[in-house]
Amino acid sequence: MKALHFGAGNIGRGFIGKLLADANVELTFADVNQPLLDALNSRKSYSVRIVGDNTQVEAVSNVSAVHSGSQDAIALIAAADLVTTAVGPQILEKIAGTIAQGLVKRHEDGNTRPLNIIACENMVRGTSQLKQHVLKLLPEAHQEWVVEHVGFVDSAVDRIVPPSEAGSDDVLAVTVETFSEWIVDKTQFCGEPPAIPGMELTDNLMAFVERKLFTLNTGHAITAYLGQQARHQTIRDAILDPKVRAVVKGAMEESGAVLIKRYGFDADKHAAYINKILSRFENPHLHDDVDRVGRQPLRKLSAGDRLIKPLLGTLEYHLPHDNLIIGIAAAMHYRSEQDPQALELAELIRTLGPQATLVQISGLDADSEVVAQAVNVYNAMQ
């Protein structure tokens, strides 16, 4: 089986790329980072350091790389059995052109083997969004053929992969946590789903997407925002602070109550899932910076993301949400000179004030009790 994976960064190499290579898939990475491409093509392998109770280093071999916008990438899409991505939500639209050109070539070449495309991104139904970007760019003459021969398969992914530590002289070395989860919507495949160990199939993807979004992502973000407020540097430092931990755990329990109501999750099992995530945040081998985890606050405060979506669920089911409100207020305080969204957030608050800013970003009702609560908590944090 041949696969092209867009995104040769740490998540691409340390998570999805590793699973594909471990399954003996003929794997090519696509990226725009030339030094990374050169290193992959020269060495054809890299090492993944897996850290937990025991640390081990595993080799990933027989890989190659092409530039994301190249004719080579287009040719690979025309011939591949699987295309995956780990590029970040905002980059999906940028790779849609290459994918569309590859699908046109595939049709013109007469390749009728099923092709499945899976976006492995930190977002809800990312592949469905990628599909819309691709179809917009696809000439009409090819649309029907693509719908018939190409599966766009949504997925939920979960693995903490921090940036490489400063001082590492190996551009390809990557560190990941032991835990990983890749769940895909088995109803969306074209043809039979490939047998890839570590890729789990489900016909109820949204339950798992929201479980991860409302627990791992909600908890991670609130840990980062409260951690920055308390002047902690890493996620581990922050979650070991009893005051931060109490709010983070409380917020995950509030969002968890929504999941239990909406999807019928078992309460005891979900409590264990929350505790597992807290222990992942404490991992002493992962030096995950609060500034990195908190970046892109405008996206994280939008209606469909990790802070507002669980809050809306608590309103829908008339459930408590005090800790989620604290997390939202802390997110509005997030500052980073390196993050354009953080700079934009600060400017919005300066010009509009916190209430109008929150309403504009989140879509919440300006006169709602939750907006008033969030603004009160925000002001108290000054």
UniProtKB/Swiss-Prot annotation:
Keyword vocabulary terms for this entry: NAD, Oxidoreductase
InterPro entries: 6-PGluconate_DH-like_C_sf (IPR008927), 6PGD_dom2 (IPR013328), Mannitol_1_phos_5_DH (IPR023028), Mannitol_DH (IPR000669), Mannitol_DH_C (IPR013118), Mannitol_DH_CS (IPR023027), Mannitol_DH_N (IPR013131), NAD(P)-bd_dom_sf (IPR036291)
GO terms under biological process: mannitol catabolic process
One GO CC term on file: cytosol
Catalytic function, reaction form: D-mannitol 1-phosphate + NAD(+) = beta-D-fructose 6-phosphate + NADH + H(+)
SUPFAM superfamilies cross-referenced by the UniProt entry: 6-phosphogluconate dehydrogenase C-terminal domain-like, NAD(P)-binding Rossmann-fold domains
Single GO MF descriptor: mannitol-1-phosphate 5-dehydrogenase activity
HAMAP family listed in its UniProt record: Mannitol_dehydrog
Family: Belongs to the mannitol dehydrogenase family.
Protein name (record): Mannitol-1-phosphate 5-dehydrogenase
Organism whose genome encodes this protein: Pectobacterium atrosepticum (strain SCRI 1043 / ATCC BAA-672) (Erwinia carotovora subsp. atroseptica)
Lineage: Bacteria, Pseudomonadati, Pseudomonadota, Gammaproteobacteria, Enterobacterales
Gene: mtlD
